UniProtKB/Swiss-Prot annotation:
Annotated Gene3D superfamilies: q2cbj1_9rhob like domain, Rabenosyn, Rab binding domain
Cofactor dependency: Fe(2+); L-ascorbate
HAMAP family for this protein: Hydroxyl_YbiX
Enzyme Commission number: 1.14.11.-
Keyword match Nucleus: no
Protein name stated in the entry: PKHD-type hydroxylase Dtpsy_0528
Enzyme class, broadest EC rank: oxidoreductase
Length: 227
């Protein structure tokens, strides 16, 4: 399941983040790649331990906590602190699958990566190339969203970033461990929750159909969630 979420950040917020990121020192992104991914990764990143990365990452986390579509789709248990990357001058990231387990920064605690997220911080017309291509059961989906919009996709997916031939593609990226590990179960819960949300304004709050559907959702979540 690949889900686009509009306006996680406002245009004003994007401009503020970009002003700070554009003035920052960028490092070779290959230094943070795994052994196999290192050979296909050509981009730049902000140092994860920098005050800037941590402060901007916290801002994104606050926005995610008030984004209902993200909560519904991801059912987040743990979110890896957001990172920032930049692709320019032919920068690209070849086909790879994200690591299944990651240590949270500054701790010995591991998290499982169920979902990967890219939050776009550059408008599509600012750069050529730079599409996020995600392989799924129905073929390859190319994603290039407006600044402030975000895409969620399974971390198990083979994916790549095509070469940027003009301008710069700037984004934040991170991973989510979900309360519901199984992708099929998580998709069913998301579809059911979205149906409930669409039905809610059309019927009375005590409508038996709405009450029953809501009960089904929570009982399935109770069965499948692993807090």
């Amino acid at each position: 399941m690949l889900i686009s979420i509009d306006q996680v950040l406002s245009k004003t917020e994007v401009r503020d983040l970009r002003a700070q990121l554009d003035a920052a020192a960028w490092e070779d992104g290959a230094a943070t790649a795994g052994t196999l991914a290192k050979s296909v990764k050509r981009n730049q990143q902000i140092n994860d331990g920098s005050e800037l990365c941590q402060r901007l990452g916290q801002h994104i986390l606050r926005r995610l906590s008030s984004t209902p579509l993200f909560i519904s789709a991801a059912l987040p248990r743990t979110i890896y602190p957001p990172k920032f990357n930049r692709y320019a001058d032919g920068g690209t990231y070849g086909a790879h699958v994200d690591s299944a387990l990651m240590f949270l920064p500054g701790s010995h605690q591991q998290m499982r990566t169920d979902l990967s997220a890219t939050l776009f911080l550059a408008e599509p017309e600012e750069y050529d190339g730079g599409e996020l291509e995600v392989e799924g059961p129905f073929g390859v989906q190319a994603v290039k969203l407006a600044a402030g919009d975000m895409v969620l996709y399974p971390s198990s997916s083979l994916h790549r970033v095509t070469p940027v031939t003009r301008g710069a593609r700037v984004a934040s990226f991170f991973w989510i461990e979900s309360l519901v590990q199984d992708e099929g179960e998580r998709t069913l819960l998301f579809d059911l929750d979205q149906s409930i949300q669409q039905l809610t304004p059309l019927v009375a709050p005590d409508d038996p159909r709405l009450v029953q559907l809501t009960g089904v959702y929570h009982n399935l979540l109770r069965r499948w969630a692993r807090p």
